């Protein structure tokens, strides 16, 4: 959510999103940076009880330190660090971030190949910056995202290795609703925990893709019930399909995601 866009900030109060990210970076012109910073900090309480994150400007820019210090005192749930290239940037930010969690944008080739080190340096969430990554790759947007599959996999694998969250990047075409739904399902199937959006019209599709369906929940319960009926067995069958311990773990994860 651009912290320079007052109308968008007001509308965000009623959005059905799990996390509100107030952006001080790409969506804010240089002459508006200071005002946007003040506005983001001031309006932050308006978005409770949802999780709030402030994306600050990158290290090396004139606004980075002021953004970092203001965000650290803001009461935000996390600070999102963009344009990372190495874990040392996370370590340096940690010194000024107080007790606020750090999220890391994985949007440069160096960040991608250092994703696990960035996570181990203290990031609590990896956010794939697909637009900047494609720009750095000198690639083009594709409907099937085939040129981003490696980046998507590496981002998720690093997050899983570190035991933290991974979020997929944005989808730019607001008119291609089916393409966006497909992108959400793809991100879910790659293992991402959620997806960034750039417009309120995209929220419902993300929530649907990343929320277990009634059929998912019913089957997960059947799996756990089947294991409960045969305690001590490592392998069982259900509907003529072999199930092992990892299937019970998947079922439990589905129910946990559904809040059950």
Enumerate the language-model features and the residues they cover.
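Expand to "…catalyze enediolate/carbanion chemistry for C-C bond making/breaking, isomerization
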Residues: 1-260
